[in-house]
């Protein structure tokens, strides 16, 4: 952009540099799945989700959350305090740094590591249908950073630990369930 006099002004250059810096960025975070669900949620304050959300919670491996904090901080410099993730806040507790909670309105793709090769496992609901609850599975989550937000872009299951209802209950407890 040329301004009067035929030179590029400092403010224009600064804006272009900021825009170049805040292009979407992808960061990989390794960890263990602690929860995976889809649907609408009702919060403590009574607010409800308007649409189905796809949620994935992981416990990041050592040093992974710090790596994400370093990469994500510039994307939240001008964000409203209500929209800043807990792990990025100055007063973040150890509990806030222990888990990474991801949610999306769109299903994100999964892949699975099999015999040293990455194989497509489908989208979120396919994984739930095929493998059930994958709590305890080792994963690598690719997080997409954009200005003021972060989203799960994809998940690669490195070590699958699939669970069924019988894994949560003993045989005696399972027989007492109303649908058994």
Which positions does each model-derived feature cover?
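Residue-level recognition of well-ordered beta-strand positions that form the cores
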Residues: 57-59, 142-144, 156
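Beta-strand/loop nucleic-acid-binding surfaces
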Residues: 102-128
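Broad gene-expression machinery/nucleic-acid interaction feature
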Residues: 53-55, 138-140, 152
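OB-fold/S1-family single-stranded nucleic acid-binding modules
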Residues: 146-167
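"Short basic amphipathic alpha-helical interaction patches in structured regions
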Residues: 73, 115-116, 151-156
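OB-fold ssDNA-binding interfaces and closely related basic DNA-contact patches used
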Residues: 2-108
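Exposed beta-sheet edge/beta-hairpin loop segments within beta-rich domains
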Residues: 118-139, 145-149
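Short acidic DE-rich linear segments
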Residues: 10, 171-180
């Amino acid at each position: 952009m040329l301004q009067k006099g035929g030179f590029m002004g400092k403010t224009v250059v600064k804006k272009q540099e900021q825009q170049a810096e805040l292009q979407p960025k992808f960061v990989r975070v390794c960890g263990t799945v602690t929860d995976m669900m889809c649907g609408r949620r009702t919060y403590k304050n009574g607010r409800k989700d308007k649409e189905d959300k796809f949620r994935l919670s992981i416990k990041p491996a050592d040093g992974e959350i710090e790596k994400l904090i370093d990469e994500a901080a510039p994307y939240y410099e001008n964000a409203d305090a209500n929209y800043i993730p807990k792990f990025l806040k100055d007063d973040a507790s150890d509990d806030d740094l222990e888990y990474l909670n991801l949610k999306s309105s769109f299903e994100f793709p999964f892949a699975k590591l099999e015999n040293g090769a990455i194989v497509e496992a489908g989208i979120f609901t396919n994984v739930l249908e095929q493998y059930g609850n994958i709590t305890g599975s080792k994963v690598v989550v690719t997080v997409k950073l954009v200005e003021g937000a972060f989203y799960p872009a994809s998940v690669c299951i490195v070590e699958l630990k699939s669970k069924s209802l019988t894994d949560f209950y003993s045989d005696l407890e399972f027989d007492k369930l109303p649908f058994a």
